């Protein structure tokens, strides 16, 4: 993103460094968000992810959403990153996300199921969960007519299989009902819109998340990514 109002990189770097020395994570994060938005360097993303991951009280879904974005921008580097990311996806019940993460780790020659027994077990568990995912989707489809939460979950599962339009439809249907996590549904909608190339609408969805929500920091990360995409 370029423009007349673009802040100077060196000044942002200096300010975030000062806030880091002061242990002021809120203002440091604000500076890092601007560095990522305007300059997008891998180190800025990495530092911003570190702050996000250190936030207390994140749910399994929120932690996984950070992993998803780290994968997209190339912040998963070592075997532990990919293994932890895949485990997060399994815990949150998105086995195809776990498969995607493990496949990327294999392609990057960071993971090797043939020589690492731990990776081999994780790959097998993931493949077994993916094989059983059809039944899970069928169950959610049945529930979704009367359960808004099931509809949003189904939409996110569709999204992990690149069924983007079906995902959007399911999430929107769920948002019409009573949800346990309405702010999370807004992030889910943003995902489905961004996947279809609807960037302005996706940004609006991410930005609509309440600032007081635990989803707020995750939504800001995705909003920045969508604005740069």
Question: Could you describe each region identified by the protein language model?
Answer:
Residues 3-14, 23-29, 38-49, 59-64, ...:
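Generic helix N-cap/helix-start motif at coil->alpha-helix transitions
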Residues 19, 52-53, 88-89, 158, ...:
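Residue at a conserved register position within TPR or TPR-like alpha-solenoid repeats
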